[in-house]
Amino acid sequence: MQKHSNLENKILKLLNTEVMEERAKIPKKIMFELTNLCDLKCQFCSTHISKRKKGFMEFDFFKRVIDEAMNLGIEECALFTTGESFLHPEVMKFIDYSSQFDLYTYISTGGRCLSEELMDQILSSGLKSIKFSIDAGNEETYKIIKGCDVSLDNLHHTIKYLYKSRNEMKSDLNI
């Protein structure tokens, strides 16, 4: 264990306090719920039973919040909380806007809403990462967890297409 002098301890305490106070003032990540609609009924999620009014975030509100957050030094932008963001009819507008900044912009999806055309748009958008909610290792368990008639094989096909297209387009999207 390294010993510090009394003066060193005071300096370390002062530095740690100032650094922590400064970091605490400014959030580094912002998360958006683009919609609270979802095409699944996952066993672990309350979105499908929520009594909240269903709807979509307005782009002008999103733009205003992003602009203000950028002025505060935000570093990450998550385009999901509950709901399936790709059900929003203007999802690419949100992705394109947030991706134009020096932000690590990412999204999570169940994957059912992703057409090949939409995936190609995603690959050229500047989105940094897309995460897939898989939640099971076999078809039977997947259907139980997702709470509806879904296909794990279809999701695998979607992810494989995205990987193949990413390599062909030389995109830097993390999957």
Locations of the language-model features?
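Conserved strand-turn element in the central/C-terminal portion of the radical SAM core barrel
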Residues: 105, 159-175
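Conserved alpha-helical substructure of the radical SAM core
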Residues: 2-129, 141-145, 149, 153, ...
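Conserved phosphate-donor/acceptor-positioning beta-strand/loop module used by diverse small-molecule
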Residues: 132-134
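A glycine-centered beta->alpha junction motif in the catalytic cores
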Residues: 136-139
